[in-house]
C-alpha cells in the first residue's frame, strides 16, 4: 500500500554523530514503511552509504550560520517542498532549523525539530538563536534530561499547545550484534582523547 507522506530531514552534515546517524537510520526506515524519504545536507561521510534508490539526497549549504545563506536556504527549501510536495520537514540543528521554520510557515507544512543537546545560551541573542528548536509543531527531546532542560530554559518561547515527544536513542541490533566475535587481528584500541564532559556538568 502506497503512502502520500513525504518526509524531508535537514541536517548540516551527515557525519558519524548521534544526530547524523539518527537522520541516516530514519531516512532508510521511512521507505520500508511506505513513506518517501528526503535529506538536505551540505555533505559528510555517511553520504556514500545512502541508498539513492530509497532516499532522495539534495546538497545545500545548510551548515552555514551566515544569515544571508540561512535566508537563501529557506528559499531553496520552499522550492524543494513545493516541487516534491513534502508533507513534513524535520530539522536537526539550529541554523537549518531557521531556514526550515520560514519555509514551512510559507508553505504551511508540518515542522518537526529534534533537540539533541544542551546548547550554550549565554546572552539573550544566543538564547533567541537556540529557540528555533522549540518553535516547531512537534519537539522531540532525546532524553528526559533534555526534556527538562527545554522546559526550564526555554519556557518563554513555548506555547501551551506545543507537543513534545521524548525518544531515547537506540542501537541497530543487527549491526551491534553481541554474538559477533572479532578475531584478534580485527580488534583495535579505543582512543579516549576526544572524551569531554558536557558544559553543564558539575563535579
Locations of the language-model features?
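An amphipathic, basic-hydrophobic alpha-helix
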Residues: 52-53, 63-88, 98-106, 127-134
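Helix-loop-beta element that forms the nucleotide-linked donor phosphate-binding surface
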Residues: 53, 147-171
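Conserved small/polar residues in nucleotide/adenosyl-binding loops
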Residues: 193-199
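N-terminal strand-loop element at the rim of the active site
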Residues: 4-5, 9-17, 21-68, 157-163
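Short His-centered aromatic/hydrophobic patch
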Residues: 91-97, 115
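A conserved, positively charged/aromatic
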Residues: 105, 111-142, 148, 156-158
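Acidic anion/phosphate-binding donor-loop and adjacent secondary structure
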Residues: 66-69, 148-151, 168-186
